[in-house]
Amino acid sequence: MPDTVPTAAELLKPQLPPIIRDLLTSLGAPVRIVHERPGSGPPRVQAALLEDAAGSLLVLFPGDQLLDLHRLKTVVGRDLVPAEARRRQLLDGARLSALPGLPALIDAPCLYDERLLQEPSLLLDSGQPHVLLEIDREVYRSLLADAHGARFGMPLVRLRHNLQRHAAEPMEAVQGFTARRIRQRLERRVEIPPRQNTVRRIHQLYGNLRGCSDDDVTDLIETDPALAAQVVSWAGLSGTAHHPAPERVLSVEDAIVRVLGSEVVLNLSLGLSEGKPPEPPDARDDMTSYWEAALYTATLMDGLCRAMPRGTRPEPGLAYLAGLLHNFGYLTLAHIFPPYFKLLSQHLQINPHIPHALVEHHLLGVTREQIGAWLMEHWQMPEELTVALNGQHDADYRGRHAVYANLVYLAVNLLRNRGIGDTPQEEIPPRLLDDLGLTRARAEEALDRVLAAETALRVLLAQPE
């Protein structure tokens, strides 16, 4: 029947998940369905589900604030942690992509930051990707009738100011007690074992030394961030008075073929593998794994280099390493500083709307990028890698070796646009593309080629026996 055929406008209208639509109807709460748009607009309500031995607590706070569990404890007197298992069960059962700030949806007491009700209207997650609910203040106040209000969120403006001040004055970053302890520990001997899958392949290659080639060893090492970094470091530090190392080690292949040799690399790798392999950082189901993100970024860095004009291309081996190691500080935290890593992981889970650098600097006085860069310096890695790690989130960086930092910024955000990675998405400025000699179309083509090789990349990560 013609009158039942939906119009084009109706087909394009965003739809709410049934459980949210029915809940709003039963509550008699009028809302406006809007598409998610970056930039200004009503404040967004963040919802965090927490728990302790006494039970669960739903916490609602503005999106321009950070939820600090220690500060929250001073308000509620409870040692709360993310209720990740229950959150995931709730989202999966209701087929929601995110937790809406609707207290009636969850069988748990609710605490909200009073500053939410200072705004004329608010935005709530709908549970449908990129679809939000705009709700007037008085309507939302009625939904919070049984909840308790308090002030506990930390304004991001203050956190950004502190981070920018320390970025402008690098020595400030090591003045805090925690940051100072981290740097002092990194200045002692640090060894990070390879992944378990890498260890299995190392044993296989070592058991067949005559049959394995330099390419076999290089291909394996280049899939493991920790092992790749340490192999390049060994090569750079391997010189003696009688046998100096090459002036520059520019890639994993350089380190293996020109300096160390496959047998030495496998022997040293076996020694490293006696330590406990690092667990994948932050193994939340809805996040791309650390290992995948590292390999995707490295592979895309290689593709972007090839797409650049010949005269402006950086060293491809160093560009690949910059991508592979771009998040190396996070892996270092996980392996060397487990208590700090646990604290950080909890706060990243409940503050997914905030760039990780703000969370890390607030909690530790230092960011993962600074930690990774410190370790690059201590291992005497090429300066380009230190710059790439430190400058990767600054789209305006144009200092020494800027091409590496700019390429990492580009690669990470191209991947994030396609749903790979777990950091808040940032705009890619046209000027950055211009300075790299790239167009957005050529950059996207490089990304398409990487994603087309997804099966091959997953095989590399799996390293099947």
Task: Label every model-predicted segment.
Residues 153-345, 353-426, 464:
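Conserved alpha-helical "signature site"
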